[in-house]
Amino acid sequence: MESMTLHPPSETANADIDVVLVTGLSGAGRGTTAKVLEDLGWYVADNLPPELITRMVDLGLAAGSRITQLAVVMDVRSRGFTGDLESVRADLATRGISPRVLFLEASDESLVRRYENNRRSHPLQGGQTLAEGIAAERALLSSIRASADLVIDTSSLPVPALRAAIERAFSSESVAHISVTVESFGFKYGLPMDADMVVDVRFLPNPHWVDELRPHTGQHPSVSHYVLSQPGADEFLDTYHRLLNLVIDGYRREGKRYMTIAVGCTGGKHRSVAITEALAASLAPDDDLSVRVLHRDLGRE
């Protein structure tokens, strides 16, 4: 069950940098949360000493700095953890910054199961039982949980659901952004190792057998026109575009942010290049996609 109580930053918060302090119970998902925030464009510092957090913020406020969103993962194993957190909040307040505190928790049963699956001991366990270590940490962090801006219970949240919760709270985009690479290649040189989807366009006539087209690549207007004007080319592009829209929606739901579509022909010079350019052009108008074109095997012949 996801428990969310979010309070916006105060009116005194500095608009030049947004700061989130990520904490919570060990095993509740701090590491996963850090990765999600990184994917959202946040600069993430894991277990940065408290005395360096304000210095990091000062760097973010400096002219020309690219740090506009800073997330700091704070670990209960730090000495004087509770006091450290309050000290950081007070120091940032003097700079006109009101950081948000994200607290991650889970049920004792869920935490025990996760630790047993990973065969790890709890940081506060010592010579005690795992359950006692969890109870000690829960008591230690009770005051921080009470004052947190956002509390997420990850007991029954799979990773995609946790990612979605983090995105709702901390993404500046209403729809998750996905980076798409459309890559042409030649089958005779092997499949791209990083391809998520592979499509074979050797069903189209090969410009290699047209003397005036052979020297050119699929980027040349005459070759592109030849390939795209073949029977079935338009229908293929339209159908495959609609298929990709379904897949992209699924990627968003599963929290995937990168996709590589490999388009292959025999040598990676004519048909795959022309189709790659056309397919990328059809995806480019989607503001929620970042489309990149790569022609792996151009120049190899």
From Swiss-Prot:
Regions that span the bilayer: none
Single GO term (MF): ATP binding
Keyword field: ATP-binding, GTP-binding, Nucleotide-binding
Binding of GTP, residues: 75-78
A Pfam family recorded for this sequence: RapZ-like_N
Keyword Transferase among record annotations: no
SUPFAM superfamilies: P-loop containing nucleoside triphosphate hydrolases
Positions contributing to ATP binding: 24-31
InterPro entries tied to this protein: P-loop_NTPase, RapZ-like, RapZ-like_N, RapZ_C
Role summary: Displays ATPase and GTPase activities.
NCBIfam families: PRK05416.1 (NF003828)
Family statement drawn from the similarity comment of this UniProt entry: Belongs to the RapZ-like family.
Full protein name: Nucleotide-binding protein MAB_2783c
Protein source organism: Mycobacteroides abscessus (strain ATCC 19977 / DSM 44196 / CCUG 20993 / CIP 104536 / JCM 13569 / NCTC 13031 / TMC 1543 / L948)
